[in-house]
Design a protein with these regions (language model features):
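Short pre-active-site segment immediately N-terminal to redox-active cysteine/selenocysteine motifs
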Residues: 97-100, 104-108, 141
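N-proximal helix/coil linker or "cap" segments that precede and/or mark the start of modular domains
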Residues: 22-82, 95-96, 230
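Thiol/disulfide oxidoreductase modules built on the thioredoxin-like
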Residues: 155-158, 166-222
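Structural microenvironment flanking redox-active thiols in thiol-disulfide oxidoreductases
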Residues: 114-157, 168-179
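A short beta-strand-turn-helix
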Residues: 79-100, 121-126
Length: 233
């Protein structure tokens, strides 16, 4: 934001639009653009539509086509996990056509924590959509309530419910659900997107762009929603 501090607001705005076009927005840039959108006299009906209009359509379609090729359809084992907020979350309670995004992470995993900014952007994007849920599962790590609360407070994470992966019988490794969805690996962060009892998308690692991660998650959600729309016709 150095251009803004120098009073070069037009240049700063153009730079932020460039970041949006390239899929390289940080949460700060995203919020600044939201503020600018509110001042526009002529604009699309929603901020999200305006942001989408800044991105080259051919690049967006290229990314979507790549993601379509990565859509899978693998049944997942039913699970029950303890919630950091209290109570339990059961996969049996997920509704028909509900899309559930699960982010497997750990307190010791720096890339996992770095990716949470992008996941917050995705959570905010679907904050008013009751058909999409997000859960953040502590795996391969003992959940430290004080550290989790401190991390959430420091970064102002909102509406990001933390779950605790289950322990195998006789062990203390907290990886039961993780292992059932990602057999043969132990790498995190991992994302799994679920729908109607099946894993529909999986992704490992973090590319470093918060808005790039938001786009990836939202494009997959759009693809899965389109499936439902086609089925209804």
């Amino acid at each position: 934001m150095s251009l803004e501090k120098l009073g070069k607001h037009t240049e700063a705005f153009e730079a932020m639009k460039g970041a949006a076009s390239a899929g390289q927005m940080t949460p700060v840039i995203y919020d600044k653009l939201r503020e600018h959108y509110a001042t526009l006299k002529e604009k699309p009906a929603t901020f999200e539509a305006w942001i989408a209009s800044l991105k080259p359509k051919h690049e967006v379609e290229k990314i979507k086509n790549k993601l379509r090729a990565e859509i899978i359809d693998i049944p997942f084992e039913p699970f029950v996990m303890e919630s950091h907020q209290g109570g339990k979350v059961k996969s049996a309670s997920f509704k028909k056509d509900e899309i559930v995004v699960i982010d497997f992470w750990a307190l010791w995993c720096a890339p996992c924590i770095a990716a949470l900014d992008g996941m917050q952007m995705a959570v905010d994007l679907y904050a008013n959509d009751p058909t999409v849920k997000f859960y953040f599962v502590i795996t391969q790590d003992e959940p430290n309530r004080e550290k989790i609360d401190a991390l959430w407070k420091k970064n102002d994470f909102r509406n990001m419910e933390v779950l605790y992966d289950a322990n195998p019988k006789g062990k203390n490794s907290r990886n039961v659900v993780y292992k059932s969805m990602f057999p043969g690996t132990s790498g995190i962060p991992q994302k799994a997107i679920l729908k109607n009892g099946h894993i529909r998308y999986r992704a490992e690692g973090y590319g470093g762009s918060p808005s790039g991660l938001m786009d990836e998650i939202s494009y997959v959600i759009e693809i899965l929603k389109e499936e439902g729309n086609h089925a209804e016709k």
